[in-house]
Amino acid sequence: MKTRLVNSLAALALLFGFCAPALAQQVPDAIINNDGIGFSRMADGQLIAYDLVAAYDEHMIVEADCSAYKSRLQGVDWCFASAANQSSFEAATQDNGRNKYLPFVGGHCALGMSVGNLTARGDPRTAVRIGNLLVLNGRFEVRTSFLQDTERNIDNARLRYELAIAAGNLKVNE
């Protein structure tokens, strides 16, 4: 009996020893991206990128042209619909890497993040500018729920996002 217990514990230790590196690799990115492209989504196996400058400045969801207009910031490529929008994005980038156009809480679903869901992805089509924040949610119905208590949801999402990064539960994109 004692031998079987020791063998079982050894097997569990071995199993967790092999799983630990795999679990460590499962930490979600701080900035949501698809194949390295931020403010994008997958549809029918195709990557669709959107112009976050158009979403922020013009309140319009516009598809971007990654082959013509692309900038890299915080380990992610950002695509634009025009050279003017790319220039606006680049001009807004500060020395510390901050940029007003970057999606709030890294493009995660803001309502999901406000309740601690670190894996809920924001859909760029739901983007809405609230003050100086470009806020995404997973679906339009979720955005509606988020907007019912915007201030509290923004505060909770910001806090949980910052705590998740500090605790290593979200990894900073490189």
Where does each model-flagged region fall?
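Sec/Tat signal peptide C-region and signal peptidase I cleavage site
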Residues: C19-A24
